[in-house]
Curated annotation (Swiss-Prot):
HAMAP family named among the record's database cross-references: UreD (MF_01384)
Protein name: Urease accessory protein UreD
One annotated Gene Ontology cellular component of this protein: cytoplasm
Listed InterPro entries: UreD
Biological role: Required for maturation of urease via the functional incorporation of the urease nickel metallocenter.
Record flagged with keyword Cytoplasm: yes
Keyword Chaperone: yes
Keywords: Chaperone, Cytoplasm, Nickel insertion
Family the UniProt entry places it in: Belongs to the UreD family.
One term of GO molecular function: nickel cation binding
Organism of provenance: Shewanella halifaxensis (strain HAW-EB4)
Main location: cytoplasm
Length: 305
C-alpha cells in the first residue's frame, strides 16, 4: 500500500474571502477536562462548554452562518492534553457554496496527548453544485491516546433532486500515532461522473467515514454486529462496511503496524440522506463508548434539535 508521508494539499494563496482560525486546548484542572486556552480569528467560535457526563468536556463549534464560498479559509487546531477527554460537534451542516473561481479551504489538525481521548463528531459538509474545495484532516495521537471521529460529505442536495453536476472536492485524511502513519487517504470528486462510478460513490450522494483507534478483536466484533443491525434497519437507504488496519486486523495484507495501540478500524458509509448515516454512526459510537467505559454516553442535545 502506497502511503504518502506528507500532506500534498497546501493552503491556497487567495486575496478573496475571509480567513477564520480557531485553536482550542483542553487539559485536566480540578479533576475535570476544561477548555484551558482559546484563540480565534474571524467568525469561528464556540459556545460555552458542557458537562453532561461529569468530567468529559463537550464543546459545540460554531461555523459562519452564511456558509463557505470560494477564497474562504477555515482552520481548526484542537489539542487534548494528557488524560483529558473532549467531545466536539457542530449544531448544523457546513455549507460550501458555488465557487467564484477561487478555492475554499478547510483544515483540521487534531492532537491528542498520552492517555487522552478526543471525540470529533461534526455534522455533515454539504457541497453545492459548482463548489471548489480542498479539505485536510490531520490526527496526531500520542501513546495510549484514543480517538473516535467521523466525516460525512454530501454532494449536491439529493432531497431537492439537485446533483453535484459540476465543481470539485479534494480531501485528505491522515492519522498518525507517535509520528507513525496509521492511515492516509484521499477523496477526489469532480462532478456527477465521479459520483456515478462504481469505484467511487456508486451513485450515492453521500459518503461517510468513521475512524476508531485503538481497537481489539472483541471491539471489532461488536462494531460489525452494530453495522449488520443498522444495515438491516435502513436497507437500501445506506451501504455500510468496515476495514481494519493494524495488529487487530484479520487480514495480514492490511497490517501496517505491529502494536495493539496502532490498530484502527474505519467504517464506511454511502447513502442519499444524512439521517440514516448519522443514526448508524451514532449507534457505533455508543457501542465503542460502552466498550471503553462500561456505560453509554450522553448524546449531545444539539443533535436532537
Amino acid at each position: 500500500m502506497n502511503i504518502p508521508e506528507s500532506v500534498s494539499y497546501k493552503r491556497p494563496e487567495s486575496h478573496f474571502g475571509w480567513r477564520a482560525e480557531l485553536s482550542l486546548k483542553y487539559g485536566i484542572k480540578r479533576e475535570k477536562t476544561r477548555l484551558l486556552e482559546r484563540h480565534q480569528l474571524g467568525p469561528l467560535t464556540v459556545q460555552k462548554t458542557f458537562y453532561p457526563e461529569g468530567a468529559a468536556c463537550h464543546t459545540y463549534l460554531l461555523h459562519p452562518p452564511g456558509g463557505v464560498v470560494g477564497g474562504d479559509q477555515l482552520s481548526f487546531n484542537i489539542d487534548v492534553g494528557t488524560q483529558a477527554h473532549a467531545l466536539l460537534t457542530t449544531p448544523g451542516a457546513t455549507k460550501f457554496y458555488r465557487s467564484n473561481g477561487e478555492q475554499a479551504w478547510q483544515s483540521q489538525e487534531l492532537t491528542v496527548a498520552k492517555d487522552g481521548l478526543l471525540e470529533w463528531l461534526p455534522m455533515e459538509n454539504i457541497f453545492f453544485p459548482g463548489a471548489n474545495c480542498k479539505l485536510l484532516t490531520q490526527v496526531n495521537l500520542a501513546t495510549n491516546a484514543r480517538f473516535i471521529g467521523w466525516e460525512m460529505q454530501c454532494f449536491g442536495r439529493p432531497m431537492l433532486a439537485e446533483t453535484f453536476d459540476n465543481g470539485q472536492v479534494l480531501g485528505q485524511t491522515f492519522i498518525h500515532r507517535d509520528h507513525r502513519v496509521l492511515l492516509a487517504e484521499t477523496l477526489r470528486v469532480k462532478s456527477q461522473s465521479h459520483i456515478d462510478q462504481a469505484a467511487a460513490l456508486r451513485n450515492f450522494a453521500m459518503s461517510g467515514s468513521l475512524y476508531i483507534t485503538p481497537i481489539e478483536p472483541e471491539l471489532i466484533d461488536k462494531i460489525n454486529q452494530v453495522i449488520d443491525e443498522q444495515q438491516l434497519r435502513f436497507g437500501s437507504e445506506i451501504l455500510l462496511g468496515s476495514s481494519e488496519i493494524g495488529s487487530a486486523s484479520t487480514s495480514s495484507a492490511m497490517s501496517l503496524t505491529s502494536t495493539a495501540e496502532d490498530s484502527l478500524i474505519v467504517v464506511r458509509a454511502l447513502g442519499q440522506q444524512t439521517e440514516p448515516m448519522m443514526a448508524s454512526f451514532v449507534q457505533i459510537w455508543r457501542c465503542v463508548r460502552l466498550h471503553w467505559f462500561g456505560e453509554l454516553p450522553e448524546v449531545p442535545r444539539i443533535w436532537s434539535t
